[in-house]
Amino acid sequence: MKVILKADVKALGKKGQVYEVSDGYARNFLFPKGLAVEATSGNLNDLASKKANEEKKKEQEKQEAQTLAAKLSSLSIEIHTKSGEGGRLFGSVTNKEIAEALKASHGINLDRRKLELKEPIKALGTFNVQAKLHPEVTAQFQVHVKAS
């Protein structure tokens, strides 16, 4: 019997895949637990339309990430913080502070976990910050850290 998996099943496969399994395994295990449905033509059509919608949604997310990346790469952000002698900061500038500065100065709401710093910013100056907006799209922008 052919079944379409509704969830990942260990030792069988991933959600959305079609498999040939024995009738007993399907009726006694997969169907009662809601892990699979029978692969009828209607269910296969539903699966195909869901996959097409997912692809369209992923492509749209990628396009949005690319437009945001183009916008971010032209920006630079200023952060004012307390510093000691020789340009060393008291503490460091974190992703959270950079994300807040982005929102305050340019109105871009970006999750702090998407910002990648090679190392914490602990001095005054200009630094490049990379933002991973999508698995295939990254943007780089400058952060100017100045004494307050």
Swiss-Prot record:
It comes from the Bacteria. One of its GO terms (biological process) is translation. One of its GO terms (molecular function) is rRNA binding. GO terms for cellular component: ribonucleoprotein complex; ribosome. PROSITE patterns: RIBOSOMAL_L9 (PS00651). Keywords: Ribonucleoprotein, Ribosomal protein, RNA-binding, rRNA-binding. Binds to the 23S rRNA. Belongs to the bacterial ribosomal protein bL9 family. This is Large ribosomal subunit protein bL9. It comes from Desulfitobacterium hafniense (strain Y51).
